[in-house]
From Swiss-Prot:
The gene is carA. This is Carbamoyl phosphate synthase small chain. One of its GO terms (biological process) is glutamine metabolic process. Keywords: Amino-acid biosynthesis, Arginine biosynthesis, ATP-binding, Glutamine amidotransferase, Ligase, Nucleotide-binding, Pyrimidine biosynthesis. It catalyses: hydrogencarbonate + L-glutamine + 2 ATP + H2O = carbamoyl phosphate + L-glutamate + 2 ADP + phosphate + 2 H(+). The keyword Amino-acid biosynthesis applies. Pfam families: CPSase_sm_chain, GATase. It is an enzyme of class 6 (ligase). Small subunit of the glutamine-dependent carbamoyl phosphate synthetase (CPSase). CPSase catalyzes the formation of carbamoyl phosphate from the ammonia moiety of glutamine, carbonate, and phosphate donated by ATP, constituting the first step of 2 biosynthetic pathways, one leading to arginine and/or urea and the other to pyrimidine nucleotides. The small subunit (glutamine amidotransferase) binds and cleaves glutamine to supply the large subunit with the substrate ammonia. Composed of two chains; the small (or glutamine) chain promotes the hydrolysis of glutamine to ammonia, which is used by the large (or ammonia) chain to synthesize carbamoyl phosphate. Tetramer of heterodimers (alpha,beta)4.
Length: 383
């Protein structure tokens, strides 16, 4: 549905493709990598997830904004996606928690959107040709001018975006900011486990799940070094999700390598953190054609499958991980890429998907308990 005060907008891809629709949200122009998310719900969590920094997100579900936005479902204080591409904008929002329409929220936060375009055709283009840079614009410029702009935009490969979304100051996170799903947890320890989380673009839901599993979390900037981490006397270190190319996050790789070599602490990485752990162990990463962004990706090896929430454009090359030191424990069953690994001799593991969901299924929440169990074992032996 067109915006009530509709203005024409263009989406121009770097290959010359032009789609014309209606502007919504903030009026203006923005360049980013065009990707797609196949989830039917959770657009507020997606748009505020720092892992989407630098991207124009196409939603495959045909209508957006049905439930508006609320104060609980944000993964950060503000949106991190650069733009929104939708087939249709809902004419009204209806939900008991709704505090604002998606359109107004996007306008307030300066988030540019385009609707009324053939998202099915666009997703087929991205699926067949891969993610590509594009520009959304409602500022009146011609498609030819926009094409010239987007062709000068940098590729996602080689970009360290984690440094742009990370906190600049340490902070503590010890109580959940919202009520979550049925946690099904055992009694918390009398003394919470001290966890240092390295913020490459961390989601609030991850912090909430760590707390729900009995952790007191100190969040440090993405450029924290080993001395800074160890000064907090952690019982475990968590490497967070985040945007961009993992191979460009030199400080994170150096820290993970130092932790592996000198700290002998439980290490747990999710998404970008998983990739950084893999790189620190000697592995290599590569860019996926169009990435994994959705809520129903099956992952496993044999005997048990987890339906998972995913959001990443890079993956670890299975052949690059050092054997037998590192074991691949889960594969994405859609394309057989590495979904999780563990170290055979150290309390270290990484998973490519999102056990905290938000949005998505909770099949993989037990990985937080797995991390806590490693810290409990270390505490029991006086580590």
């Amino acid at each position: 549905m067109p915006h009530p005060s509709s203005r024409q907008a263009h989406l121009v891809l770097a290959d010359g493709t032009v789609l014309t629709g209606d502007a919504f949200g903030h009026r203006g122009s923005v360049v980013g990598e065009v990707v797609f998310n196949t989830g039917m719900t959770g657009y507020q969590e997606v748009l505020t997830d720092p892992s989407y920094a630098g991207q124009l997100v196409t939603f495959t579900y045909p209508e957006l904004g049905n439930t508006g936005v609320n104060g609980d479902d944000q993964e950060a204080d503000h949106p991190h996606a650069r733009g929104v591409i939708a087939r249709q904008l809902a004419p009204c929002a209806s939900n008991w928690r709704c505090s604002e329409s998606l359109d107004n929220w996007m306008e307030r936060h300066g988030l540019v959107g385009i609707c009324g375009v053939d998202t099915r055709a666009l997703v087929r283009r991205l699926r067949d040709g891969g993610a590509i840079n594009g520009v959304i614009s409602s500022d009146g410029r011609s498609p030819a001018d926009l094409l010239a702009e987007v062709r000068h935009a940098p590729s996602m490969e080689g970009l360290n975006l984690a440094s742009q979304v990370s906190t600049t100051e340490p902070y503590e996170w010890s109580s959940p900011c919202r009520v979550g799903f049925d946690q099904r947890l055992k009694q918390h320890p009398d003394l919470p486990y001290r966890v240092v989380a390295i913020d490459f673009g961390i989601k609030r839901a991850i912090l909430d799940r760590l707390v729900a599993h009995g952790c007191a979390v100190t969040v440090l900037p993405s450029d924290a070094d080993l001395d800074t981490v160890m000064s907090h006397q952690p019982e475990g270190v968590f490497l967070s999700n985040g945007p961009g190319d993992p191979a460009a996050v030199d400080s994170g790789i150096d820290l993970a390598r130092s932790l592996l070599e000198r700290a002998n602490l439980p290490l747990f990485g999710i998404c970008l953190g998983h990739q950084i752990l893999g790189l620190a162990l000697g592995g290599k990463t590569f860019k996926l054609g169009y990435g994994h962004r959705g809520l129903n990706h099956p992952c496993g090896t044999s005997g048990q499958v987890e339906i998972t929430s995913q959001n990443h454009g890079f993956a670890i090359s299975a052949d690059s991980l050092p054997e037998p030191m590192v074991e691949v424990t889960h594969l994405n069953l859609n394309d057989r890429t590495v979904a999780a690994f563990q170290h055979r001799h150290q309390p270290v593991f990484g998973i490519q998907y999102h056990p905290e969901a938000s949005p998505g299924p909770h099949d993989a929440d037990h990985h937080f308990g797995r991390f806590v169990a490693l810290m409990a074992d270390r505490r029991d032996v006086g580590g």
